[in-house]
């Protein structure tokens, strides 16, 4: 290892992906981390995670992304996994209005179990199913503005805005951490577990940014 590598700063951020069951959380994560999609994916049992690496301002940033089960009977178990999270994607299915109506409950749970400075992204998934849309883009934007969230619609099926959604959250966390100087050894130790690092395409965020809708009160 070179001296440059040894002296290189490293950040490790925990991000949770939350929302009702079957909104596509697991497929969003697998599309982002492994560029995979499963049309017959089963409901997540418990919690799974992937780690993705990217470079920001010459620093290595690793996002440890946790996929929490949406089924009600698992919520008490997964609540412990909010601990240490500095980012969250709150996902609903644009074809199922009930999942959009549940967003407020998920945001309340996030507020209870995490810090108020968590970077939050509202994600309307399955935008490839425009012909059976039940929640308009305008409704998603309005809720995001009301709650002070970033907002984007995605499709795990065709990859639309998937990288953009995750990387906007990661960048916002990085900016928050840089400002508050939270990159302490204690903070990093809290989030360190066995993981697999995956390297992103450096140009991917810029390529997809044109399709991104951002709504924030800050």
UniProtKB/Swiss-Prot annotation:
Major localization listed first in the record, in broad terms: membrane
GO molecular function: GTP binding; GTPase activity
Motif segment (Effector region): 41-49
Membrane topology according to the record: Lipid-anchor
Highest rank taxon of the organism: Eukaryota
GO biological process: protein transport
Binding, GTP: 19-26, 67-71, 125-128, 155-156
Modified residues (Cysteine methyl ester): 215
SUPFAM superfamilies associated with the record: P-loop containing nucleoside triphosphate hydrolases
Keywords: Cell membrane, GTP-binding, Lipoprotein, Membrane, Methylation, Nucleotide-binding, Prenylation, Protein transport, Transport
Lipid addition sites, S-geranylgeranyl cysteine: 214-215
Positions annotated as propeptide: 216-218
UniProt-listed InterPro entries: P-loop_NTPase (IPR027417), Rab_GTPases_membrane_traffic (IPR050209), Small_GTP-bd (IPR005225), Small_GTPase (IPR001806)
Recorded GO CC terms: plasma membrane
Keyword Lipoprotein attributed: yes
Compartment(s): Cell membrane
PANTHER family (UniProt xref): DRAB11-RELATED
Similarity comment: Belongs to the small GTPase superfamily. Rab family.
Function: Intracellular vesicle trafficking and protein transport.
NCBIfam families hit by this protein: small_GTP
Protein name listed in UniProt: Ras-related protein RABA5e
Natural source organism: Arabidopsis thaliana
Originating gene: RABA5E
């Amino acid at each position: 290892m070179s001296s440059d590598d040894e002296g290189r700063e490293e950040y490790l951020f925990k991000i949770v992906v939350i929302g009702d069951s079957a909104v596509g959380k697991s497929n969003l994560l697998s599309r982002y981390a492994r560029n995979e999609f499963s049309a017959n994916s089963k409901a997540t049992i418990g919690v799974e995670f992937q780690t993705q690496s990217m470079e920001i301002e010459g620093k290595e940033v690793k996002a440890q992304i946790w996929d929490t089960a949406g089924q009600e009977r698992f919520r008490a178990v997964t609540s412990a996994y909010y601990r240490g999270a500095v980012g969250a994607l709150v996902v609903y299915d644009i074809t199922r209005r009930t999942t959009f109506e549940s967003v407020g409950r998920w945001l309340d749970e996030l507020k209870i179990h995490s810090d108020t400075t968590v970077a939050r992204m509202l994600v309307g998934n399955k935008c490839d199913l425009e012909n059976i849309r039940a929640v308009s883009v305008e409704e998603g934007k309005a809720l995001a503005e009301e709650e002070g969230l970033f907002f984007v619609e995605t499709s795990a099926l065709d990859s639309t805005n998937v990288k953009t959604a995750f990387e906007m959250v990661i960048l916002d966390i990085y900016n928050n951490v840089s400002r508050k100087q939270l990159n302490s050894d204690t903070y990093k130790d809290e989030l360190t577990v066995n993981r697999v690092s995956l390297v992103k395409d450096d140009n991917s965020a810029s390529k997809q940014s044109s399709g991104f809708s951002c709504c924030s009160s800050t």
